[in-house]
Regions:
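Conserved donor-binding/catalytic core segment of Leloir-type glycosyltransferases
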Residues: 181-197, 203-214
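Nucleotide-activated donor-binding/catalytic signature segment of Leloir-type glycosyltransferases, i.e.
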Residues: 217, 223-247
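Acidic donor-binding loop of glycosyltransferase active sites
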Residues: 247-264, 277-278
Length: 353
């Protein structure tokens, strides 16, 4: 019996994730909740977000490990806080099971040596509890095996995957900003995301081009100190259906990455593929596990303004190539990164001896 604790919606029992689990016939239960962690600054995540996660984790552990029957063999959680809470309950109940699995682990370095050391110490403690951690690149698996070599945790790689709804309406903020900044709004390209982004390079690349760029990013840090060109529209509160609308109507997607040693950009990349949108993305070892240059995407050198600008110009001028990339991207999504593929890969990793 596997217990899952999705935090994206209280109605997760009827989600595509739940339906694919049911289709596989794997004994499982879902204990859903809605824990929204959308904050412009990291301090609010620490002060407001993590207490929400802690409350959800305690409630989930009680429902899963005490109130439910039969008890689970495995629990799959989405945060380090949940690992600790479930580990405490497992110890207090004098049980060897369930196995505790951390899904979607990413370990980012901090520029301050002390902060880096403290985070390393903290996660060594987390991995003295967790039995398994799922990562979304093989590079990270090898890296974490080395960093946390004395831990009890088994690190596994599975590709990221998702389902995205095609039903979407623009937000009021989106309508107002577009009307104010682009009264004759027409074609635009889209960039989105906050983690590991290199918007400085992207802004320099698009500044002289005759095309609008919409950037969906709610992080103050990711955009701090940047000069925003006149043809760039920032959407800081664009989520859910409004974000999908932005994606659906874009000519194509550009994902500039600053990091090359962790998973970054895959979510937006796969969302673009689901809508048959070609993507220009920074070439990194993790990205190259998901797409192929010239087949379903264009890969560019990190920090190279000229190469990025030329890639954008190519997709703007070559309609046939753009359509071919989009079609191949959608085929790749359906075969490798849709919800069915993701759930199949996840269950396969959980069931490994």
């Amino acid at each position: 019996m596997i217990h899952f604790f999705p935090t994206f919606s209280k109605g997760a029992k009827n989600s595509p994730f739940a339906k694919e689990l049911a289709a596989l016939g794997v004994p499982h239960r879902l204990f859903p909740g809605e824990v929204i962690l959308r904050y412009h600054a990291r301090i609010w995540l620490l002060l407001l977000g993590w207490p929400k996660v802690t409350k959800f984790a305690i409630s989930s552990a009680i429902r899963s490990l005490i109130l439910s029957k039969p008890y689970p063999d495995t629990v799959v959680v989405g945060s380090h806080i949940e690992v600790i809470i479930f580990g405490i309950f497992r110890a207090l109940l004098f049980r060897k099971r369930p196995n505790i699995v951390l899904l979607g682990f990413i370990f980012t370095h901090r520029p301050q040596p002390l902060a880096n050391w403290l985070r390393g110490l903290y996660f060594r403690f987390v991995f003295s509890i967790a039995d398994q951690a799922i990562c979304h690149s093989s590079l990270e698996v090898e890296r974490y095996k080395e960093i946390f070599k004395s831990s009890r945790t088994r690190f596994e790689y599975i590709p990221y995957g998702l389902h995205i709804s095609v039903d979407a309406d623009p937000s009021e903020e989106q309508r107002t900003l577009e009307k104010k900044n682009f009264p004759d709004a027409g074609d635009y390209i889209l960039s989105a995301g906050r983690s590991g982004r290199d918007y400085a390079t992207l802004f320099k690349a698009v500044a002289p081009l005759p095309i609008a760029l919409h950037v969906v990013c709610d992080s103050e840090f990711a955009l701090s100190g940047l000069e925003v060109p006149a043809n760039v529209l920032l959407l800081r509160n664009c989520y859910d259906k409004a974000y999908v609308q932005e994606l659906k109507n874009a000519l194509f997607v550009v994902i500039p990455l600053q990091v090359n040693d962790i998973s970054a950009g895959q979510m937006v990349l796969i969302q673009a593929m689901a809508f048959s949108k070609p993507a220009i993305i920074t070439r990194t070892p993790t990205v190259e596990e998901y797409v192929t240059e010239g087949v379903d995407s264009i890969l560019v050198k990190r920090g190279d303004v000229v190469e990025l600008r030329e890639a954008i110009q190519r997709l703007l001028s070559d309609q046939g190539f753009k359509e071919k990339l989009g079609a191949h991207a959608n085929a790749t999504y359906k075969s490798k990164f849709c919800m069915k593929a993701y759930v199949t890969n996840l269950i396969g990793a959980l069931q490994k001896p």
